[in-house]
């Protein structure tokens, strides 16, 4: 079992590992103009870091813990269909929605100045 961290971004918690890419709903702290490809990001909302057999838990977040990464590109999630119908009224409405996502890759996880790569 390698090094991983649990971060909070876009209203959800993600288990991230260095060298892998993930899709997040949004980065609330970033301006949409900054969300270009290869933009570097720092995520400070780190809930937990696991390195080999040691586990560091935050309450609610870890101090001096940073997940460094870069944005690959923005994309859309799967389309969901919303269908509203009023019975006996001939009222039907069908809508589609696709969530805007940002795909980012995690470069490193650091805690108290010590960087973890895999």
UniProtKB/Swiss-Prot annotation:
One of its GO terms (biological process) is translation. Keywords: Chloroplast, Plastid, Ribonucleoprotein, Ribosomal protein, RNA-binding, rRNA-binding. GO terms for molecular function: rRNA binding; structural constituent of ribosome. Disulfide bonds: none annotated. InterPro entries: bL21-like, bL21-like_sf, Ribosomal_bL21. GO terms for cellular component: chloroplast; ribonucleoprotein complex; ribosome. It is found in: Plastid, Chloroplast. It comes from the Eukaryota. Its main location: plastid. Belongs to the bacterial ribosomal protein bL21 family. Part of the 50S ribosomal subunit. This protein binds to 23S rRNA. This is Large ribosomal subunit protein bL21c. The lineage of its organism: Eukaryota, Viridiplantae, Streptophyta, Embryophyta, Tracheophyta. The gene is rpl21.
């Amino acid at each position: 079992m390698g090094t991983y961290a649990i971060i909070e971004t876009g209203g959800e918690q993600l288990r991230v590992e260095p060298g892998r890419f993930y899709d997040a709903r949004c980065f609330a702290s970033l301006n949409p103009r900054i969300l270009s490809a290869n933009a570097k990001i720092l995520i400070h909302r780190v809930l937990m870091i696991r390195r080999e057999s040691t586990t560091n838990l935050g309450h609610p977040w870890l101090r001096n813990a940073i997940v460094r990464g870069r944005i690959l590109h923005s994309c859309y999630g799967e389309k969901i269909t919303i269908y509203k119908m009023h019975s006996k009224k001939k009222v039907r409405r069908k809508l589609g929605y696709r969530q805007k996502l940002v795909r980012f890759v995690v470069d490193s996880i650091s805690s108290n100045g010590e960087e973890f790569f895999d």
